[in-house]
């Protein structure tokens, strides 16, 4: 009974975290599924968003403005990765690693603003600052409950992205990911669309970082470590469970958010079962591996191919 009570009490927190990471998962979806680019910048840009947001709020900047600044900082990180890849000819995965590596020092510099040196952790209290979301109110039946706020946030975000990817520019971005050679033949500057896609993706990741730092009450230099794996887990879980049902683009983005919620509910359940937090990364890797393997096995072992008819007429 104590286990069930503890599990139920922890569910609101898991859902709230899932919604925040769902925004990050949408960013991963844009590069992984739409652009078909393996971008590892997100491990750094998530921390950049958190660092920028917390530093600005601590210096008296309104939360809304701080979140916009965090998003722009993430877009700048995506721009750097995009230029590494398109202008310098560096492979996308290596370009992301280089930017991620550089962002570690950049984030330390940002978090040390006004303190005379780099800081690995910056706390921020909802008692002193008007934050948009906070874990303190996750069980409150009020409008400041982070679940309610984040649901509205995700709905608006998905609506805006659905509109954007329906525009000519958005369709060009999707065409680039589908077939770069054909996109070029249609007069699309694929270098521009790749850079734009990376900017949008990392902007969303940094936005999630800003929200996460508010929710947990601090920004940490290592908060983005392993973010790409969590994002991939959310995207893949959503696709495996809802891939046959959700055909609309907006619903596919929704599936990524739901995948993140499911991921955190599962992680929460496993932790309540007694698993050490030291093993979370191992469990995450196993979850991603399993959900990546399922579609392959389904296609290989459970999909019947066309039956070939033999006989004299076909000899």
For each feature predicted by the language model, list its residue ranges.
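Helix-loop-helix "hairpin" substructures at the membrane interface of multi-pass membrane proteins
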Residues: 77, 143-224, 228
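Membrane-interfacial amphipathic/re-entrant helices at transmembrane-helix boundaries
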Residues: 1-24, 52, 59-65, 133, ...
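Transmembrane helix-bundle core of multi-pass membrane transporters
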Residues: 92, 96-166, 196, 220-221, ...
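Membrane-embedded helix boundary and interhelical linker motif in transport proteins
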Residues: 32-87, 140, 245, 272
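Loop-to-transmembrane alpha-helix initiation sites
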Residues: 17, 93-94, 123-127, 146-151, ...
